Swiss-Prot record:
The lineage of its organism: Bacteria, Bacillati, Bacillota, Bacilli, Bacillales. The keyword Transmembrane helix does not apply. Binds 1 Mg(2+) ion per subunit. This is Amidophosphoribosyltransferase. Residues 11-231 form the Glutamine amidotransferase type-2 domain. It comes from Staphylococcus aureus (strain MRSA252). The gene is purF. Pfam families: GATase_7 (PF13537), Pribosyltran (PF00156). Its EC number is 2.4.2.14.
Length: 494
């Protein structure tokens, strides 16, 4: 099976302007975004004269140590990044923010997401003489900015943003301003907050604003960029060719439950999805349990709707990184054994409804079902609070091949047998859309559900040929039976 090259990320970005402890607050903000990436972190700081940065591999506490933080003190502006990346792209050179020193200015830049035309842009830039120092998509936009003929940095940024495709947010720092930008579909979230002293904050999630005691100001919407400087804050559009398609996986899995995306609290959405799942797929049992942590809200909703007790049948070791975003399959499988254990006294002899947020590869849920049955569970009915994860994601989630997706080749009945469950049911696409409750005048009410439908709102670009060449029979069947709203370049099909 062909493996798509490229750097698929699910990361967290943070920025702050005009605070005497900018680096320290950035560190705190990144700590609240640690769930978005555990393989590296970095901070770039700025004042009126210079930019400097520190970065490292591992969790934030491993990547940026006390002596590094000391070197970042005394600066008023900062951006920061926590990173997840596919294996093979884990070197220090790819840890963000990337920092560039040019003859006329210095720039720090970091991003969350994936640029689906980065490969072709990179090839064209190299033909023009560009030299790349990392394999990160982020470096592509820096080359585009520097090669622009636009008269100002802001104009060059706007011009460059129009050339890149995919799901992304950027945080960019110069000595003059802090910039943030969101893709034309708002697939990846970016929010603005304000502290009591007037300091502005940029972050991937509202939880990073809340942790600093700041107030939420606004979401940055599809095709918008924000400029924060000593004059204040300005939000502008760099393109009017926009269709809102916020990643459903942000609500389902990635975001913290205390975050709010497009006005919808993540915990409330997950609980609503559990209730909807119970309405769509009830089953007789003694109790409901959830897979910690991202499934607990949905499990509580399912239990409440069906009128069963919600029990803690699984306990998680909170100090083990999340398995879905571990870079290799071997590490993911080892991680399940280390991080979860069944509570035997709770599950022994019981018929259990096990709620999980998604089935991607199937390995994790298979081990959990076995763990519960080994601990004495009589029956385990699996309920998934999202639709079948049938199609690759190219917008910033590390699932970019059909071969990785169990639902691409197996039916729910076949997956039920594979994971050893007594029954298996998924939330419908319509049920997911209703549970999240967005009301944009856009396909899927403003959600990006590409992994469940094969409908890609930002298009496919560099991935198109190989994606189409490796569609499974089951994927082709789904596509032939269901309406698609977007073409391969992300244009709306009229």
């Amino acid at each position: 099976m062909f493996n798509y090259s490229g750097l698929n990320e699910e990361c967290g970005v943070f920025g702050i302007w005009n605070h005497p402890e900018a680096a320290q607050l950035t560190y705190m903000g990144l700590h609240s975004l640690q769930h978005r990436g555990q393989e590296g972190a970095g901070i770039v700081v700025s004042d009126q004269n210079e930019l400097k940065g520190e970065r490292g591999l591992g969790l934030l506490t491993e990547a940026i140590k006390d002596d590094q933080m000391e070197r970042l003190k005394g600066y008023q502006h900062a951006i920061g990044h926590v990173r997840y990346a596919t294996s093979g792209n884990k070197g220090i050179e790819n840890i963000q923010p990337l920092l560039y020193h040019f003859y006329d200015m210095s720039v720090g830049i970091c991003h969350n997401g994936n640029l689906i035309n980065a490969k072709s842009l990179r090839q064209n830039l190299e033909k023009q003489g560009a030299i790349f120092h990392s394999s990160s998509d982020t470096e592509v936009i820096m080359h585009l900015i520097r090669r622009s003929k636009a008269p100002t940095f802001e104009e060059a940024l706007k011009e460059s943003l129009r050339k890149i495709k995919g799901g992304f947010t950027f945080a960019i720092l110069t000595k003059d301003a802090l910039y943030g930008a969101v893709d034309p579909n708002a697939i990846r979230p970016l929010v603005v907050g304000k502290m009591k002293d007037g300091t502005y904050i940029l972050a991937s999630e509202t939880c990073a604003i809340d942790v600093l005691g700041a107030e939420f100001v606004q979401d940055i919407h599809a095709g918008e960029y924000v400029v924060i400087n000593d004059k204040g804050i300005t939000v502008k559009s760099y393109t009017h060719h926009t269709t809102t398609a916020i990643s459903a996986m942000e609500y389902i899995y990635f975001a913290r439950p205390d975050s709010t995306i497009a006005g919808k609290n993540v915990h409330a959405v997950r609980k609503a999805s559990g209730k909807m799942l119970a309405q769509e797929s009830p089953v007789k049992a003694d109790m409901v349990i959830g897979v910690p942590n991202s499934s607990l809200s949905a499990a509580s909703g399912y239990a409440e709707e069906i009128g069963l007790p919600y029990e803690m049948g699984l306990v998680k070791n909170q100090y083990v990184a999340r398995t879905f975003i571990q870079p290799t399959q071997e590490l993911r499988e080892q991680g399940v054994r280390v991080k979860l254990s069944a509570v035997k006294d709770i599950v022994d002899g019981k018929n259990i409804i096990l709620v999980d947020d998604s089935i991607v590869r199937g390995t994790t849920i298979r081990r959990i079902v076995k763990m519960l049955k080994d601990s004495g569970a009589n029956k385990v009915h699996v309920r998934i609070a999202s639709p079948e994860f049938m199609f690759p994601s190219f917008y910033g989630i590390d699932v970019s091949t059909t071969a990785e997706l169990i639902s691409a080749s197996k039916s729910p009945e076949e997956i039920k047998d594979y994971i050893g469950a007594d029954s298996l049911a998924y939330l419908s696409v319509d049920g997911l859309i209703e549970s999240i409750g967005l009301d944009y005048d856009a396909p899927y009410s403003g959600l990006c559900v590409e992994s469940f439908t094969g409908d890609y709102p930002a298009g496919l670009y560099d991935y198109e040929a190989n994606y189409k060449a490796h569609l499974s029979h089951r994927q082709k069947q789904y596509i032939s039976k269901n309406k698609h709203y977007f073409d391969s370049e992300g244009n709306l099909n009229v």
